[in-house]
Amino acid sequence: HLYHRRQRQMCIRDSPYLPENTISSTTLALAKKTNDSGHQVRVFMPRFGVINERRHQLHEVIRLSGMNVVINDMDLPLIIKVASVPGARMQVYFIDNEEFFKRKFTYTDAEGAQFEDNDERTLFFSKGAIDTVEKLGWKPDIIHVHGWMSSLVPMYLKLFQADNPIFKDAKIVFSAYDNGFEGGLS
């Protein structure tokens, strides 16, 4: 069996918080099944502006407040929100920053054009999720990364967290999806 007692699953889309598609339904089903098997699962995703905080009962994690993420020369506030998955004993941590995730769209604008700062949003999400796990002191055995927006997590862990006792023994699984991403990141 691949999963041990602690698994952190990082994903970009998760039902019921965003409209259902291949990634959201797959990540939710996998996380629930793993959690139901007795493993500890933590799900991380961006707190996109389309997510209704009231309906999904998101609330800020005060003990994690005051954290910042540095990207290039920008020192950006990191806000962590949490909600419970309906019908499961599992929490979803939302990585939030007004500049990157307040928009009412996920990756593209109303005309379908990619946001020019998707690369910085990807960095912020990846670093924010890693920093959050480190501050929680929660040592994952497996980190399952889903989709392109969390695809920098393995590289970041290898380059900057290789000796960190929280992450050094973690195994990484990457799941890629054909979700219509067109274009590139700078």
Which residues does each predicted region cover?
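A conserved catalytic-core segment of Leloir-type glycosyltransferases
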Residues: 47-135
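Generic beta-sheet signal
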Residues: 44-46, 175-176
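A short, Lys/Arg-enriched amphipathic alpha-helix followed by its capping loop at the start of a domain
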Residues: 29-39
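A short, glycine/small-residue-rich beta-strand->loop->alpha-helix junction that serves as a flexible
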Residues: 13-26, 52-54
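Single conserved hydrophobic/aromatic residue that forms the stacking wall/gate
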Residues: 1-8, 12
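Hydrophobic anchor at the start of a short beta-strand
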Residues: 39-41, 92, 140, 172
